[in-house]
Amino acid sequence: MQFETTMQALSALREWEQTMAAYSHAEGVLYLDATTVAPKDTWEGRGKTMEILSKITYELSTREENGEIISFLEHHLEELDLQAKREVEVARKQFDQTRRVPAEEYIAYSVLLNQAQSVWAEAKNNNDFASFAPYLEQIVQTNRKFAGYYNPDMDAYDSLLNEYEEGLNRQILDDFFDQLRQTIVPLLGKVMKAEPIDDRFLYKHYPIDKQRIFSDYLMEVLQMDRSHCTIAETEHPYTTNFNNKDVRITTHYHEDSLASSMYSVIHEGGHGIYELGCDDCYNYSNLAGGASMSIHESQSRFFENIVGRSRPFCQMIFPKVKELFPEQLEGVDVDMFYRAVNKAQPSLIRTEADELTYCLHVMIRYEMEKQLIAGTLQVADVPAEWNRLYREYLGIEVPTDREGCLQDSHWSGGMIGYFPSYALGSAYGAQMLAVMKHELGDVIGTIAEGGMEKLKAWLGEHIHRHACFYKPGELFERVCGKFDAKYFTDYLTEKFTVLYHL
């Protein structure tokens, strides 16, 4: 392919990016429909559609002329601005990586994941791991094979980690998790010996229609533009974005738990705030969306925990909670509510875990993923290994696979290597808070008096607007300096020492 000017080649690159974004939009709408409102036995027809779309997107991603566009631009980088240079860099990585995957395997994997999502949801509902196991076996095998395609000279699990956080590897994570354990385990031991916090009122009967009203209220508190972001209901909460003007978050409701959906909405709201804050200039390009999953989780965990579980936030929303649920919260004051939503104790469900024990849930999944990809753990043995690790890490027995290895949707979606992002994101958020406090003062303490606007503006300026322009490590260091997990361990120590009067 011949180009008369560099700008002509750049225009061709951006036309390709826009086309890929359009197909991604279509696939995303299909996925959203599948996980929210589609009848459970509709996966077969949808699978055919996904197969056709996957074939088209593979062909578009790997066309020889696209490689020529990239090569031409690589030889004329001095004529490009910084954004265009970054687009070329990302396009090269994506082009080379996709071309290494045989077309038939790429398409078959898309079909497999469509089926696996439906089978997983049914298996979870029926507490039937055996029905999901064959799909998980194929997903693990495919990820192991694709890891070799993506980064032939890299360890397979390290390769998968890099799909979610560039530059991440097992050594970094092993050291990080060791550092967390040194603080979390002894601190949890002290907490368990302290006077327990009464949170029984959070588990009374909370009508779902009232919880939906509460979710809408939380969206208002987070100052989310409902003309560009809405809430749907699904088995496992998640957020998806089609561009920075169209973001969808999902949640689930349990009549016997107020906090479950409350914190799902705030967590997913954090993801949504990030996507809505990306600069318009990156729309429909390969730089659209969040910088990485760890940076993304830093935003969701920041709003869920640092904001949403703070006393000022609880004080701000408590009148509305009392208004909606007067009988359930009779005799409960704001201090009791704040302490209850922060109660630390070993538990079964990751998404409902407290701040202190949450990373132990992530470590369990990390250890299992390493073994699955290395081939030292067989899929048939996943339930037993899951249960063993929960006994070892949290000292609890797992009664059912529904509450154990079937609780998360990630593996059915092929996202092996994602889980560490939650722990890294939590630590990133604590360091961001320290920098924010240094620059702005106590924004959390003044959250009802303009603090929410200030912290959102700070995150928007320093993190959100940049989308994928910077690599995740570069973005973080520009804002916070060198990553140091001690900010997170100090945050946990201070919070739970005060909360439990240790």
Question: Where are the regions a protein language model picked out?
Answer:
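A well-structured
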Residues: 1-166, 468-471, 493-502
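C-terminal, non-catalytic "cap/extension" segments appended to globular domains
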Residues: 2-9, 25-31, 35, 41, ...
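Active-site recognition of the HExxH zinc-binding catalytic motif
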Residues: 13, 151, 260-279, 297-301
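Secondary-structure capping and boundary motifs in well-ordered enzyme cores
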Residues: 45, 105-108, 135, 207, ...
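Contiguous, non-catalytic segments that form substrate-binding/exosite surfaces or channel walls
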Residues: 109-260
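Inter-helical turn/loop segments and adjacent helix faces that build the functional surface
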Residues: 122-130, 167, 190-199, 279-286, ...
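A glycine-rich, aromatic-flanked flexible loop/lid motif
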Residues: 234-236, 274-275, 331-343, 354-362, ...
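Post-HExxH zinc-binding segment in Zn-dependent metallohydrolases
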Residues: 289-330
